[in-house]
A protein has these predicted regions:
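Pseudouridine synthases involved in rRNA/tRNA modification
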Residues: 1-30, 83, 216, 229, ...
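RNA pseudouridine synthases
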Residues: 1-195, 209, 338-351
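Short histidine-centered loop motifs in beta-beta connectors
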Residues: 50, 213, 219-227
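Short coil-to-beta-strand transition motifs
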Residues: 76-80, 201-210, 316-317
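Short Gly/Pro-enriched turn/cap motifs at secondary-structure boundaries
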Residues: 135-136, 201-204, 310-314
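Short beta-strand segments enriched for Tyr within beta-sheet-rich domains
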Residues: 157, 232-240
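Active-site lining segments that contact anionic ligands and/or coordinate catalytic metals
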Residues: 209, 221-223, 233-235, 317-319
């Protein structure tokens, strides 16, 4: 891979290191890798001559960087899993990820991941490279996700995310009616003590900001568009739980809200097994009081899962859109991932209720 920069009048006596970092977006770690390399496939050159990074350029000098990314994917087993490719070129690949799919192999999920599927897709083209996730999604969150095909692209897009020029938008269904057309949730998030996975709101947490906008209101739920100013783990899900509008179908960050009681009461839903188990009478369930005030957390959780499963089998959260500047082509890319069928079905049910 080659990157080129032609020095202008303002660059007189400027170091190559400054140009590589600020104009070509090469990270310090990549600079260290390139510093002492020279040859046909890798190195730093000015006017076709190898130079060190402290070399000072003159107007008209042509700075050329050759990078040879010799990293294969031997640690990821290719698997023939169907993927929905939204965009692909020699530098990156963008996928509409299915729900119930892990992005990258981890201890408990060594196979069946999106990385396994992409590795297979590339292997069919005779390409053996390590794919690098630029964005990440929870296992049960669907939608657009970006992978880089080399470390330079990964770093360049990560820089865009850091300076907030990389746009990510999500669509989610939350329980209850949100009255404000738009708003911002600004609550710090940190890992919950004694938990590897769970996050919670805490004064000692990292700053976390989620913006939301109402797309449509239903009798018991609201369809929202989210944009993030920060990128904490489970941020949207934790923030929605905190404002008493949990993401529909989310059994990790669940919260009982009165909209669920109304849903149960209006459609006379009955849960005989749980009623018998917890000695709760049917009248108690449907006398226009919240089950939260009458039942144990275990009972509530069972009912919560049952009601949510009638609408959707996972959290109703979808990564809808990304927009960023292509690091090589220098053109803006906007990529949209259509909603998956299970979220469409949930919205149809809400529309008809």
């Amino acid at each position: 891979m080659e990157l080129k920069y032609v020095a202008n009048e303002k660059d007189n006596e400027r170091t190559v290191k400054s140009i590589l970092k600020n104009e070509l977006g090469i990270s310090l770690s990549m600079l260290k890798r390139l510093k002492h390399e020279s040859g046909p496939d890798s190195g730093i050159y000015v006017n076709s001559q190898p130079v060190y990074v402290n070399y000072k350029v003159k107007p008209g000098d042509v700075v050329l960087v050759r990078m040879n990314f010799d990293d294969n994917c031997d640690d990821i087993v290719p698997e023939n899993i169907k993927i929905d490719i939204l965009y692909e070129d020699e530098y990156l690949i963008v996928i509409n990820k299915a729900a119930n799919m892990v992005v990258h192999p981890v201890a408990m999920h060594q196979s069946g991941t999106l990385a396994n599927a992409i590795t297979y897709h590339l292997a069919q083209k005779g390409i053996n490279i390590k794919v690098r996730p630029v964005t990440r999604l929870d296992k049960d969150t669907s939608g657009v996700i970006v992978f880089a095909k080399n470390p330079y692209i990964q770093n360049a897009l990560s820089v865009q995310m850091s300076n907030k020029s990389f746009l990510k938008e999500y669509i989610g269904i939350v329980w209850g009616t949100i009255n404000e057309d738009r708003g911002t949730i600004n609550l710090p998030i940190e890992r919950k003590p004694n938990s590897i996975m769970l996050r919670h709101i805490s004064e000692t947490g990292k700053p976390s900001i989620t913006n939301y906008e109402v797309i449509k209101r239903y009798e018991y739920a609201t369809l929202l568009k989210f944009s993030l100013e920060t990128g904490r783990t489970h941020q949207i899900r934790v923030h929605c739980q905190a404002i008493n509008h949990p993401i529909m179908g989310d059994t990790l960050y669940w919260k009982w809200v009165y909209a669920i009681d109304l849903f149960i009461q209006k459609y006379s839903l009955c849960f005989p097994d749980e009623i018998e188990r917890y000695k709760i009478t049917e009248k108690q369930c449907y006398e226009n009081q919240s089950l939260e005030n009458q039942c144990s957390d275990e009972y509530l959780f069972n009912i919560y899962k049952h009601v949510n499963s009638m609408l959707i089998q996972r959290q109703a959260l979808h990564s809808y859109k990304v927009r960023f500047l292509h690091p090589i082509k220098k053109s803006e890319l906007e990529i949209i991932a259509p909603l998956h069928d299970d979220m469409k079905k949930a919205l149809e049910i809400l529309e008809n209720k």
